[in-house]
């Protein structure tokens, strides 16, 4: 952060002792109704980018969905083992032995430890809709966790719709899973119901249940974007005691998606909770976008085309003055809350109807053209008459028309 910034975000909140990340792009991310399922080669490329970003675990898929998922999950698991990637693997499974067994078999064939993320609905809404009783849920929980442990799998026990479930049900379910051997539990805001206050409250409650069971069990947070609270809820969950946070590239996932991993990473770094090289972040997002056919909006934070781009005269003038001071940190701070350099990008000055002449001069000089008065006036007049920002080709055409190119 630039030394001239007074950071009102600084608080007395203790820095979290543990901040781990779990990437859901290749599982929950692909449950979006609009995505194209990537090829195995594309999945491998995404896996390597997850590893380059230092993300601790990646959900490789739900093998219980069928042979095609088993095939891809095993190939991904072998890639981690053969290439000695740092990222650890987990897989989703319903609380059914039929879902858990293929995970154990893949783990054994690939020679790679795989965490089993076995999930079950928990809210009264889901119980009523499905015709379940709590006794049934407890029995399924105990059987599933016990079987997975017996097969040599580490278990994260996941309750769906945790943020709309009652305390007594949650206590019973989590206590059963922990007694059966689960080493992590996951709180899921499955339909994006939670507010930051609610996210923190449910995490603190589950932490108390973990303590009642003897402690030593990690807490995950899995958020969704339905009310557009995913990032702030995830940060609230972290500060309340969650130690592993879930997300997916460009927020893809069920309905409107999951917590966007790239935005979570940027915020964790800017808050001082992580020290991480984010130079692969743009490639990570663009690769997932291309593989899934989910476009990145131009105004998407951090990785969108317009994230560090301005054609407004006042804004551009301040950035240009910072450039002239040869202070790149100032350039990245004067009109940006996220330093472009953090992710390997830079500030971009364009020319449009809201621009001043300094935009034109700066653009020309940055592109190796002499900013003569006649040329500047010509481009400036064209920009003022335009309804959009001028393209590079339009500006170069004006340069050539004056014989300056």
Model feature map: region roles:
Residues 191-196, 200-326:
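Catalytic alpha/beta core domains of metabolic enzymes, predominantly
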Residues 51-56, 82, 242-246, 261-269, ...:
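Short acidic (Asp/Glu) and glycine-rich catalytic loops that position anionic groups and cofactors
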Residues 15, 21, 32-57, 73-84, ...:
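Alpha/beta enzyme core
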Residues 55-63, 86-90, 244:
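Divalent metal-dependent hydrolysis catalytic cores, especially in the metallo-beta-lactamase
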Residues 1-27, 274-405:
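A mid-to-C-terminal "edge-of-domain" accessory segment
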Residues 38-41, 45, 67-71, 98, ...:
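Conserved active-site and cofactor/substrate-binding residues in soluble primary-metabolism enzymes
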Residues 26, 62-63, 94-95, 119-123, ...:
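Short, ordered loop/turn segments at secondary-structure junctions
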Residues 1-16, 61-67, 102, 197-200, ...:
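N-terminal glycine-rich phosphate/pyrophosphate-binding loops that anchor nucleotide-derived ligands
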């Amino acid at each position: 952060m630039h030394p001239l910034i007074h950071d009102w975000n600084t608080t007395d909140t203790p820095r979290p002792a543990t901040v781990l990340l779990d990437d859901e792009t290749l599982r929950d991310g692909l449950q979006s109704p609009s995505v194209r399922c990537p090829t195995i080669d594309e999945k491998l490329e995404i896996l390597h980018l997850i590893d380059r970003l230092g993300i601790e675990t990646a959900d490789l898929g739900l093998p219980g969905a069928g042979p095609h998922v088993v095939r891809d999950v095993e190939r991904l698991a072998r890639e981690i083992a053969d290439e000695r990637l740092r990222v650890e693997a987990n897989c989703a499974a319903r609380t059914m032995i039929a879902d858990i067994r293929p995970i154990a078999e893949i783990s054994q064939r690939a020679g790679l430890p795989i965490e089993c993320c076995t999930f079950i609905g928990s809210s009264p809404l889901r119980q009523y809709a499905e015709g379940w009783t709590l006794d049934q849920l407890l029995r399924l929980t105990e059987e599933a966790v016990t079987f997975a442990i017996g097969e040599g799998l580490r278990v994260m026990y996941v309750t769906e719709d945790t943020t709309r479930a009652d305390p007594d049900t949650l206590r019973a379910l989590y206590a059963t899973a922990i007694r059966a051997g689960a080493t992590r539990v996951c709180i899921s805001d499955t339909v994006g119901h939670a507010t930051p206050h609610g996210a923190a409250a449910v995490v603190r409650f589950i932490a108390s249940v973990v303590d009642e069971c003897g402690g030593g069990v990690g807490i995950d947070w899995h958020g969704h974007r339905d009310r557009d609270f995913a990032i702030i809820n995830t940060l609230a969950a972290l500060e309340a005691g969650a130690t592993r946070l879930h997300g997916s590239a460009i927020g893809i996932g069920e309905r409107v998606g999951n917590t966007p991993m790239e935005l979570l990473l940027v915020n964790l770094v800017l808050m001082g909770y992580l020290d991480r090289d984010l130079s692969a972040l743009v490639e990570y997002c663009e690769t997932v976008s291309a593989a899934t056919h989910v476009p990145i909006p131009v105004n998407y934070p951090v990785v969108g085309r317009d994230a560090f781009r301005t054609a407004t005269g006042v804004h551009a003038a301040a950035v240009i003055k910072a450039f002239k001071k040869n202070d790149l940190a100032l350039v990245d701070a004067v009109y940006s809350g996220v330093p472009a350099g953090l992710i390997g990008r830079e500030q971009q000055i364009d020319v449009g109807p809201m621009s001043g002449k300094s935009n034109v001069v700066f653009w020309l000089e940055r592109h190796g053209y002499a900013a003569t008065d006649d040329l500047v006036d010509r481009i400036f007049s064209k920009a003022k008459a335009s309804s959009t920002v001028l393209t590079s080709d339009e500006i170069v055409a004006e340069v050539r028309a004056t014989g300056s190119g």
